[in-house]
Amino acid sequence: VTLKVGASPSPHAEILEAAAPILAEQGIELDIVEFDDYVLPNTALADGSLDANYFQHQPYLTNFNAENGTDLVSAGSIHYEPLGLYAGKTASLDELADGAVIGIPADATNGGRALLLLQDLGVLTLKDGIDLDYFRNAEDITFSEYDGIAENPHNVQIEALEAANLPAALPDLDFAVINGNYAIPAGIADKLLATEDAAGDAAQVFANIVAVRAGDETRPEIEALVEVLKSDEVKSFIEEKYEGSVLPVA
């Protein structure tokens, strides 16, 4: 049996490559098709060109189905790309100076995740009731004028930038909170100071999934694919290769 699976080049296709030999032992051959965009893997799955894809999280898939009238579902959650706090001009949080500048992603969801991480790390405190759902449901937030911070003892300055531009800006910032998928190709794993908790809300909501056409999630070979991707062998591969910028789902 051959399974044709669409995937983003990193880390998804690399994780599938690690799973391929284990699946081959079960008589399942993986044909991995790499995509550089986030629309074609779903349209190709919907039209039957692919058996599955592996590149997105559930909120993105839910939104895609709603906008395109497709009926694609998750067959399982595999990994999570945590937001991490990376050292720029300042080497560690112990050296956090008054007025330090911290870069965060400009979009509401990821910027919100960044502020929640900074709260977990004791850098600042958000107003009561501000949680992940609050940021996910927010239309647009201008973080430069954001008034949801209750306590900011070090008077840190929050600088919101396009998520993809944060790694390049890191040398000019004291710290930055960066998405795993941008941190990996930037080669900044050695500057990682802390990440979101793998058992926390964001990890559950934004876990990357294997998606299939509705009804296919019970196909034996799809079940085998998900089982292998969640196996100890593949989990170890993820932990060793990505050094914390990609984590297996807890």
Predicted features by range, described:
Residues 75-125, 235:
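A conserved helix-loop-strand patch within extracytoplasmic ligand-binding domains
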Residues 38-69, 85, 186-188:
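Pocket-flanking alpha-helical
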Residues 110-119, 221, 229-249:
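Periplasmic-binding protein-like
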Residues 63-75, 90-91, 172, 177, ...:
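Ligand-binding "clamshell"
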Residues 82-94, 206-221:
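A bilobed periplasmic-binding-protein/Venus flytrap-type ligand-binding module shared by bacterial periplasmic
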Residues 32-43, 131-168:
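Short helix-initiation/N-cap motifs at beta->coil->alpha
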